[in-house]
Amino acid sequence: MSRTENIEHVEESVESELKQPSMYKVILNNDDYTPMDFVIEILQLFFRKDEAQATEIMLAIHHKGKGICGIYPFGIAETKVAQVNQFARQNEHPLLCSLEEA
């Protein structure tokens, strides 16, 4: 086998072994105490939603009990959940952010 054929074989092996990472939904859960404006602020600050998108998600959270903020690989989703929960506690709100497999 020539050097070129060997390199091509290795490239094909690597490409066939790679797979997409598992994706996770980052979810905000409704509660009776967190103000709607604070939920909108969270969505804009941590998930880069514009005001219209943030309002739509906030209303889904309010009416359905939870809303999806975004779908990310596990590491990113886990970080966002931790950041949101920490920010909510710092601002004395019981808002709960969680993740589930997409």
Curated annotation (Swiss-Prot):
UniProt cross-references to SUPFAM superfamilies, sorted A to Z: ClpS-like (SSF54736)
Gene Ontology BP, a term: proteolysis
Gene3D superfamilies in the cross-refs: 3.30.1390.10
Superkingdom, natural source: Bacteria
Listed Pfam families: ClpS
Purpose: Involved in the modulation of the specificity of the ClpAP-mediated ATP-dependent protein degradation.
Subunit structure: Binds to the N-terminal domain of the chaperone ClpA.
PANTHER family for this protein: ATP-DEPENDENT CLP PROTEASE ADAPTER PROTEIN CLPS, ATP-DEPENDENT CLP PROTEASE ADAPTER PROTEIN CLPS1, CHLOROPLASTIC
Family to which the UniProt record says this protein belongs: Belongs to the ClpS family.
Name of the molecule in the record: ATP-dependent Clp protease adapter protein ClpS
Organism field: Shewanella piezotolerans (strain WP3 / JCM 13877)
Underlying gene: clpS
